[in-house]
Amino acid sequence: MTSTADRTRQLILDAATEEFAARGIAGARVDRIAQASGMSKPMLYSHFGGKDRLFDAVFAEHVIANGDRVPFTADDLPGYAARLYDDYLADPALARLVMWKRLERDGTGYLYPGLEEHDAAHLRDIAAAQASGRIRADLNPDDVWTLLIATAASWAQVSITTVATRDDPAALHARRRAALEEHVRDGLCAGGATTG
């Protein structure tokens, strides 16, 4: 059973997600978050200590949830990319939070301090798949990972061309998933063949 403190924390995180996704870190207001969550500002501060720590908690919640919802496997890069596409549709706030963090805090370099080991495990899996001939060995594992994530986010909220929404027709989503899988297969998988 969820405790009252856990429910309170989640109400604050949900309201903060909406505020930060819409307005960024600098534009977000603690009073709006408190009002939207139905909590007082002192309650918000007692749980998170301030706006910056609250953003960090919101960001971590969405990034970690994405990793939990879409477990990585180097055995099926095309399928992983398609599952990421679906997850970005299900959690449009994720891409917006990533964008705001990149714009307002970490303009360059690694965006996920504290999660280095998480990504290092993915890079080891990619390197092992390269060694076994399933992923192109002429690319650095870091580059494979970056290209995979960026390609999967082609239609996410940070797209510079077209943003996909859950309201788009199912046939359009199917077409995009197929194109994404083909592009990843041809560009990252050894011999352009389906892995797995």
Kindly give the residue locations of the regions a language model identified.
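Helix-turn-helix
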Residues: 11, 15, 19-53, 57
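Amphipathic alpha-helical linker/stalk segments
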Residues: 22, 56-83, 122
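Short alpha-helical scaffolding segments that buttress acidic/His motifs in well-ordered protein cores
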Residues: 84, 98-102, 148, 152, ...
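C-terminal peripheral helix-coil segments that are non-catalytic and often amphipathic
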Residues: 86, 90, 120, 124-132, ...
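Amphipathic alpha-helical segments used for helix-helix packing
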Residues: 89-109, 158-165
